Amino acid sequence: MSTIIYPSPIFGPVRSRRLGISLGINLMPDDGKVCTFDCIYCECGFNADRRPHHPRPTREMVRTALEERLRQMKNEGQMPDVLTFAGNGEPTAHPDFAGIIDDTIALRDALCPAAKVSVLSNATLAHRPEVREALLRVDNNILKLDTVDADYIQRVNAPTGKYDVNEVIKTLQSYDGHLIIQTLFMKGTSRGRSVDNTGEEYVGPWLKALESIAPSQVMIYTIDRETPDHDLCKATPEELDRIAERVQRLGFPVSVSY
């Protein structure tokens, strides 16, 4: 099973394709994955294969570990560009997510004021008031929308609970532009069916959704590491560039990771 489980609560720093030198904050257990999606491309593997036995780190554990690591990096003269909530699952699912965001912003302001605070989220819980208020306080509120096709979402993102893409789009609209939309494009098959979302059938409706959401930026990327479903393929640079050009024509800044 060639997938990645990250240390918790702090890992890195790592060089992010999209964010620069990133110090990771993992709010999930250090021995498994807890996520509201079960994506067939997730670098952490399938949920059922990565059931954790350890608890999530507490708010105090996160604050203490982050402060220690930032002080160490400061002493070494190597400060991060960004503090990134990511890791083994959905960060907003942590019961103390909002408080942890408060602590992180305070530590950032005190120890590395030039760094940004980023959250990588699948947006399944972005409608919750306490999650929304916390996400509005971070610099980079990066929310996933791989497609607006309900069947594709069920097959590829595999939500573990109720997921209505139209309701999610309404939630994304409610952020009034304080969000970055992140979308993964890929090719290949899963269980004998195509998962290619680079064609007009998927890209056209997705672009219409972007127009209604009006994000501050769009990040498009493709798979970069081994995936639990082994029949997936990268989208080509040419395909990603063509999609990016269409995003730019809508007036949104776009970054592409190949």
Model-derived segments and spans:
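Short glycine-rich or small-residue beta-strand-to-loop segments that form or flank ligand, phosphate
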Residues: 83-88
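Short strand->helix junction
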Residues: 32, 90-91
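Short hydrophobic-acidic sequence motifs that mark active-site Asp/Glu residues
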Residues: 22-24, 82, 142, 180
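Canonical Radical SAM [4Fe-4S] cluster-binding loop centered on the CxxxCxxC motif
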Residues: 18-64
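Conserved alpha-helical substructure of the radical SAM core
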Residues: 46-82, 96-99
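Conserved AdoMet/S-adenosylmethionine-binding subsite of the radical SAM
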Residues: 93-221, 226-233
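Auxiliary Fe-S-binding modules of radical SAM enzymes
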Residues: 1-18, 71, 187-258
